[in-house]
Amino acid sequence: MGLMWGLFSVIIASVAQLSLGFAASHLPPMTHLWDFIATLLAFGLDARILLLGLLGYLLSVFCWYKTLHKLALSKAYALLSMSYVLVWIASMVLPGWGGTFSLKALLGVACIMSGLMLIFLPTTKQRY
């Protein structure tokens, strides 16, 4: 059950990260404070996506809280690295995100996935 909550947290945090990235690229820069505030108050699509991202992070924290009650911290914390993998893949697959493929990033993803496999694969008991 803890693993399920952890995966929910990772997926929701990844979607929230993508939402915040989209909003940040479409909202006026914070250096133009009045334009930024006016855009937020107009509550257009960009502002709603920003709010969705923030609420997603809040929901992700709730799932993380539930994860920590059911799963050892050493395993739970390792799950967070999956968010990097999901965001990287989504930025390349989703249209308009402009994510780029590189061997360096692929190597990083391979390291993350290898580490997760080492942590989560069951161990065999040795008899002495």
Swiss-Prot record:
Residues in coiled coil: none
Pathways per UniProt: Bacterial outer membrane biogenesis; lipopolysaccharide biosynthesis
Keywords, comma-separated and alphabetical: Cell inner membrane, Cell membrane, Lipid A biosynthesis, Lipid biosynthesis, Lipid metabolism, Lipopolysaccharide biosynthesis, Membrane, Transmembrane, Transmembrane helix, Transport
Keyword Acetylation annotated: no
CC annotations in GO: plasma membrane
Periplasmic membrane side: 24-35, 99-100
InterPro entries tied to this protein: Flippase_ArnF, Small_drug/metabolite_transptr
Any one GO molecular function term: carbohydrate derivative transmembrane transporter activity
Membrane-protein topology: Multi-pass membrane protein
Membrane side Cytoplasmic: residue ranges: 1-2, 57-77, 122-128
GO biological process per UniProt: lipid A biosynthetic process; lipopolysaccharide biosynthetic process
Keyword match Lipid metabolism: yes
Compartments, record wording: Cell inner membrane
Transmembrane segments: 3-23, 36-56, 78-98, 101-121
Self-association state and partner proteins as the record states: Heterodimer of ArnE and ArnF.
Family the UniProt entry places it in: Belongs to the ArnF family.
Function: Translocates 4-amino-4-deoxy-L-arabinose-phosphoundecaprenol (alpha-L-Ara4N-phosphoundecaprenol) from the cytoplasmic to the periplasmic side of the inner membrane.
Protein name (database record): Probable 4-amino-4-deoxy-L-arabinose-phosphoundecaprenol flippase subunit ArnF
Classification of source organism: Bacteria, Pseudomonadati, Pseudomonadota, Gammaproteobacteria, Enterobacterales
